């Protein structure tokens, strides 16, 4: 019989969540660096470089890899011979107390993104609780723990289908992945759960993402069952789609494919697919009664030495920019933004549109301005703002035409692609949409020299800020004529991949 203290589980979960906020798993870094070295698409290679640079900066500075520090998932396997001598709460409450401590840790405060009353008032819980806690009771005398933090952009692209038993899983995946766009921040992993019931398939998919990246080892030894055959087939075929890093077109879309299966009803073939983004975050540890767990930090030698060359971009002064300047930009062009940049994401856009509909003045004049879709992490120490990477732009698509036409907004900055309606509005208003790299939040924050709230302060991280930026790197993703690199890039690279040998290191 092993005696484990309540405090040991709570503090171990809190420490692990802090750890994964700034340390990528080393297998991800090595796999991404290998993909970076063999990438032939300049835009995708540049995106991967920013992710790798950002990751090293976070490891050194102990600040979040991504501004979306995620909703927490905890997997607990509790041995039947474990005794909780001093417990005053259940294990789910212990896990949530660990989440609360981690996200409110003053030296590396993490962003609270969890909202209560999701179908109603959507009120921020302020401490990122509750997490999603999965508990199994198993033979043994230890507690096995996996903690993970999953951002909303990748979680939003989760898919499920109840296929017929005769349907092709491969065909469904290859049809579905292009519909996910780039909001899930590739390159990452796809977790696929097959069998059981609807909820079991989703759980299998999420569990599979906790496994290490080992596709090259699998290629070397060969498949030993149908699940491994699917992994190998899907890995090659998904990458052959040419979606590439950040959806810009390139050789690598996924670094691995994971498949877990479970027996199912004869009439069913449930299939779930969940992507893991470039900010993949998970840690595994065991409690054996000897006290809280201390996770060993990785060596900085595990990160490649890559530097960002700001001279490659065209400097833009946001304080003097004109429609003629915007019209001169070309798709895929790298810009370095300088000057005053407004922010606003889902809640701010919803409120702005409601005010416009009522004829009420907005808290800030948007005419001739650019707005950045971001919800930053709170600053610590001497920071003016915490990590401040872009959020998924398509969620603002339904607001785009009205905001452009009724406010005189000149352009937008966000993550991933825009949908057809937004692209049409951009073209009609001779606007532009610029893309910042998802997974480079700390790197972006270093370009922000001042920050102040100028509207909707009650929205917390979704308030409207005014940033003063210096050489903030972005890419022209949709130009004033409506040409989108997220359409042209993958199309070009899908064709090129079909004609060139793709070698996996």
State what each model feature region is.
Residues 324-327, 364:
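Residue "hotspots" at secondary-structure boundaries inside conserved domains
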Residues 326-329, 335:
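Short, well-ordered loop/turn sites that connect or cap secondary structure elements
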Residues 249-257, 264-265, 278, 446-505:
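C-terminal binding/interaction regions
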Residues 163, 205-209, 272-276, 289-291, ...:
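Short, solvent-exposed amphipathic alpha-helical segments in soluble enzyme
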Residues 335-337, 341:
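Generic structural signal for buried aliphatic residues
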Residues 311-321:
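Short, structured beta-strand/loop micro-motifs enriched in basic residues and often containing a Trp
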Residues 209, 213-242, 246-249, 343-475:
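Feature captures the catalytic cores and cofactor-binding loops of soluble hydro-lyases/lyases
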Residues 1-192, 197-309, 405:
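Non-transmembrane, aqueous-exposed alpha-helical and coiled segments at domain scale
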